[in-house]
Amino acid sequence: MHEKERHGIILSAVQDRPVVTVADLCALTEASEATTRRDIAALHLQKKLRRVRGGAEAISPAPFVGLAGRPFAINETMHAPEKQAIARAAVDLCDDGDSIIINGGTTTFQLVHPLASRRCQIFTNSFPIAEHLLKHSKNTIMLSGGAIYREQNIILSPFDNDVTRNFYARRMFMGAQGLGPIGLMEADPLLIQAEQKLIHQADELVVLVDSSKFENRSSLVLCPLDRITTVITDDKITDKAAAMLGAAGVEVIVAQSGAGHKEGGAGA
């Protein structure tokens, strides 16, 4: 990632939270701690943020607090072939008539293309996913209510009793900030709250992550590994990551990017 892109992500992140730690910024930019500290120092000298102990803060915080994490437009360009292969493998699990939940994200957005030939009942909190499927498929679409967070292209409701409680699915598809021994990780408490509600509404949880996500870490844990039914990832997954999932009883499906379809295998 180029310096200009890293600086854009850092400045976006500090507008979203009172203080952003160096560790969080490393995860967002996929840069080393030393590089991240140099970026913070450079932006501090340019008076674009304020360097604080262990991280950075905004000089003029935004009145509307957004979500922590990389913007959708930046994530969309990263690991694109892997995401497309993962999405094809995920839709192979779906039959016509299935009820599914799709959590917003750039990997899950790739589901829209293979889903065009399906007829499923789909609940999503992603405006781009809903819009595309409405235009280009015969799936039945339900959209969650709430505020639209523009940079992540996701809709989150501040209310506990919303339409989410009225939809139950056979399977939920979602991405993540990171995946490790302690479980599935996310970048923002608001995402955690919304996604936990969705997870409760599905029998199976299918996590779509490219292999880089096994290296990412966050301080916020969404759910433990044993709540995950299946992980679909690309063929760069390490033996260590595959063994970690297998030990937790998680099925692993490896999608071959560039091959038109998946190669499957059980992690246990």
Predicted regions and their residues:
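Conserved SAM-binding loop
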Residues: 101, 122, 187
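Catalytic core of membrane glycerolipid acyltransferases/transacylases, capturing the structured
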Residues: 113-115, 122-131
